[in-house]
Design a protein with these regions (language model features):
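Conserved ATP-binding subdomain of kinase catalytic cores across diverse folds
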Residues: 1-88, 119-127, 138-143
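Residue-identity detector for threonine
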Residues: 2, 17, 43-46, 64, ...
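Histidine (H) residue identity feature
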Residues: 7-8, 15, 68, 108, ...
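C-terminal catalytic region of ATP-dependent kinase domains
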Residues: 21, 137-231
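ATP-dependent phospho-/nucleotidyl transfer catalytic cores
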Residues: 52-123, 163-167, 171, 175-202
Length: 231
């Protein structure tokens, strides 16, 4: 279980629980609701709860395989390796140097489960998709965690998942985005407004409409496109 407390902003009662619209916990929960509304299941089950330090959120813990155990050479879906050791079919996002001054490459797999997460990040305007926030569960699903600074009205997309930049969004995901737009025009938009501001709900709607009209993944804009640290 992961626990994240709320922080002050627009305190109000929602379904019997005191939450703060627009706080970290509210954004975590709203991001989870968007993932569920799309039917993608990217974000582990997330609930709002009152805890010993006040209102916040709890999230199902995700156990992951240790692909680096015993020096077997396995790679996580997002990882680093020597520049000359990038596996065939993987995306190289950037090159850097490690603490010993040796060159390394930041890479991620060309995996449809990870691609779905990247599309979700565009929709919820994720400003902090680090490599360590993409978890391959023991159940075979890929989960995203840490969405407390998503859903801002301004473009703040910052991610390590740039491998699909400039490519078309898969058709099945486009259908889901279309259905999300319809739901935002109705009760789901109202429900989200209990946890984020009305301007943020409107911005989510516009991002979805824009992506539906031109279903192509964005490219880095040159202004801090990678979170730091990257993991």
């Amino acid at each position: 279980m992961t626990v994240r407390p709320g922080h002050h902003r627009c305190r109000e009662e929602v379904h019997g629980t005191l939450v703060q619209r627009g706080d970290l916990a509210g954004r975590e929960y709203a991001s989870y609701l968007v993932s569920e509304q799309l039917g993608w299941g990217v974000i582990p089950r997330t609930l709002l709860r009152d805890g010993p330090f006040g209102p916040g959120m709890v999230q199902r813990w995700v156990d992951t395989p240790d692909r680096h155990a015993d020096d077997t050479g396995g790679l996580d879906l997002v990882d680093i390796c020597a520049p000359d050791a990038v596996p065939e079919g993987w995306f190289e996002i950037l090159r850097a140097t490690d603490m010993d001054g040796e060159p390394v490459a930041l890479i991620h797999a060309d995996d449809p489960r990870l691609q779905r997460m990247a599309v979700l990040d565009v929709l919820i305007n994720n400003a902090d998709r680090k490599g360590g926030h993409a978890l391959e569960g023991l159940d075979g699903s890929v989960y995203g965690v840490d969405h407390g600074i998503c859903l801002h009205t301004e473009n703040k997309l910052r991610t390590v998942l740039w491998g699909w930049a400039g490519t078309e969004v898969p058709g099945a995901l486009v259908v889901d985005i279309d259905e999300l737009i319809s739901s935002l025009e109705g009760d789901f938009g109202t429900r989200l407004g209990e946890h984020i501001t009305s301007d943020e709900v409107a911005a989510l709607y516009e991002r979805a409409v824009d992506l539906l009209a031109a279903p192509v993944m964005p490219r880095p804009n040159g202004h801090r496109p990678i979170p730091w640290p990257a993991f």
